[in-house]
Amino acid sequence: MTVHFPFQNSYAALPDNFFARVAPTPVAAPRLIKLNRPLAAELGLNPAELETAEGAEILAGKTVPEGAEPIAMAYAGHQFGHFVPQLGDGRAVLLGEVVDKNGVRRDIQLKGSGPTPFSRRGDGRAALGPVLREYIVSEAMAALGIPTTRSLAAVVTGEQVYRGIALPGAVLTRVATSHIRVGTFQYFAARQDVEAVRRLADHVISRHYPDLAGTERPYHALLDAVIARQAKLIADWLLVGFIHGVMNTDNTSVSGETIDYGPCAFMDGYDPKQVFSSIDEFGRYAFANQPRIALWNLTRLAECLLPLFGDDKDQAIKEAEAALDGFAAQFTDAHQAGLRRKLGLFTQVEGDQPLAQALFDAMAAVKADFTLTFRRLSDAAGSGDDAPVRALFEDPTGLDEWLPRWRQRLADEPQTAAERAAAMRQVNPAFIPRNHRIEAVITAAVENDDYAPFEELHAVLARPYDDQPAFSAYAEPPQPDERVLQTFCGT
């Protein structure tokens, strides 16, 4: 059975300075451990073909499928605020692009596929643990309804990688609407290659924002569009307690998808200053700082686009600043609208923002569990029973002051209690990929070659808004000895 990929590649048709042509490095004994069958079908691929030995070889990079044009993409980036003029795909290869069943062009990329010209002394490989983490979290984000790259497959390579100790090697097949980043623009801007910036901008407009192609000022409109998508994306993150952990400009997608899950984590107890990433020692990418960092990253994109705005540099700067000034309102509108939905408020009145903030203050005072607080408020909205949500607060004084204000506000809404509770359950998940659960899954796979815990967690997270009583343990926060205090970059 020949594995068929209906490749229609566009990025590989750009000039050679946009990438390096490099094939994945073959591995010893690839074995498929997970295939995302629904995603495969959505991409126009045959899952049965991918589950063959030949399919595993392709997904591990041992065999290059017909029609692929493997490349490592060039990009630069600000890493923790420090500019690095050349980064690029150091352990990933873009096999090519397919047009999915909805007419959307999607990249198919192998992560952990071996060294490239951008590897910078690295081995280009990935360990099994980070591959499983990205698979779990990216698919959980998709199930939550948050724009994200996707995971098509995970394959073990039959080889070991060395990260202080020997670990099983693995390859993740990542799917994205594109892998073009703010750092991709920075790569060419740093080289003062205005024509390449223009070519890249035209490609992004054609691929992601085709409605802008015929507008009078397409590059201004492109900046506006990327700002709008990032504002909505960061609001989505905050509404589920997600901390990206490494919001460098090379990890900021111009398509508005969450990309690069390295040290990401979901909060358990609410703390706006929460940091998990082991390398974020000063809290640059802390939970509540993410909107500010997104704007900082977008400002770097605007700097790259300035030469396309016109010959009058001062005027171009004013126009870029005006666009960037719109980010705060767009983020706030999206975030506040999301918070109203989470609180069961379907109309907007003055005082809603202070009401939400008062709840966060009460949660922060005792580090109440972020996810369960909102889920149990959903139940309380229907039943009138506040005891389950109060049980999450070691000292419920702040919550007890807040609950009457909330109920008084709910009385102004037209919905019945049952309607309100049902709507709240659709935006307040019961299940998130909690750090201690991910670590348990990784331990079972790495130490015992046991993927049953991975399969079970993945299945539960595919239905985050359903109660799933048989799996209620997955909704619980960690015990003190289960808490994960730090996460690490991996893939």
Curated annotation (Swiss-Prot):
The active site is at D250 (proton acceptor). It catalyses: L-seryl-[protein] + ATP = 3-O-(5'-adenylyl)-L-seryl-[protein] + diphosphate; L-threonyl-[protein] + ATP = 3-O-(5'-adenylyl)-L-threonyl-[protein] + diphosphate; L-tyrosyl-[protein] + ATP = O-(5'-adenylyl)-L-tyrosyl-[protein] + diphosphate; L-histidyl-[protein] + UTP = N(tele)-(5'-uridylyl)-L-histidyl-[protein] + diphosphate. Transmembrane segments: none annotated. One of its GO terms (molecular function) is AMPylase activity. The keyword Transmembrane helix does not apply. Its EC number is 2.7.7.-, 2.7.7.108. Keywords: ATP-binding, Magnesium, Manganese, Metal-binding, Nucleotide-binding, Nucleotidyltransferase, Transferase. Its cofactor is Mg(2+); Mn(2+). It is an enzyme of class 2 (transferase). ATP binds at G88, G90, R91, K111, D123, G124, R174, R181, D260. Nucleotidyltransferase involved in the post-translational modification of proteins. It can catalyze the addition of adenosine monophosphate (AMP) or uridine monophosphate (UMP) to a protein, resulting in modifications known as AMPylation and UMPylation. Belongs to the SELO family. PANTHER family: PROTEIN ADENYLYLTRANSFERASE SELO, MITOCHONDRIAL (PTHR32057:SF14). This is Protein nucleotidyltransferase YdiU. It comes from Bradyrhizobium sp. (strain BTAi1 / ATCC BAA-1182).
